[in-house]
Amino acid sequence: FDTLWKHYKRLIKENGAILLFGSQPFTTDLINSNRDWFRYEIIWEKTRPSNFFLANKQPLKAHENICVFYKMQPTYNVIKWKGNNNHASKPRLSNSNIHNLTGIKNGVDTNEDKFPKSVINVKSTDNTKNLHPTQKPEKLLEWLILLYSNENEIILDNTMGSGSTV
């Protein structure tokens, strides 16, 4: 990791963010490789789990960690979600199906814009159309780019497997 961080530190702007995808145990090694810059993680909840070859030994992997690193507060353009089941703090109602709520039910406004939470649900790509086995959904990448950068800024994707960020 030393060479990777050497080059990131050389290239990153003062208010730039470095986002890296991973899963355990790699995530722990990644965070420990630069504890000074690690700030938080976003959990991408996948709709299509992976690691079927280990299904008899451990649970399928239905999420990935997105580790966020930076030296100084980066650009952070808040992009609010509509109040639906993409949002972790959805109302908990005992006599209703919360996935079908619209408007105000039992005093809870479910159409209100919500701040993003640390767990996000973005539909996985159709793996029959994937160019790369770890390809990320364009919608997820678009959200992250809009969240952490401004128009006309340069984005480096040095882990570009299939070119989804293009």
Regions found by a protein language model. Name each.
Residues F1-V166:
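Core catalytic lobe of class I
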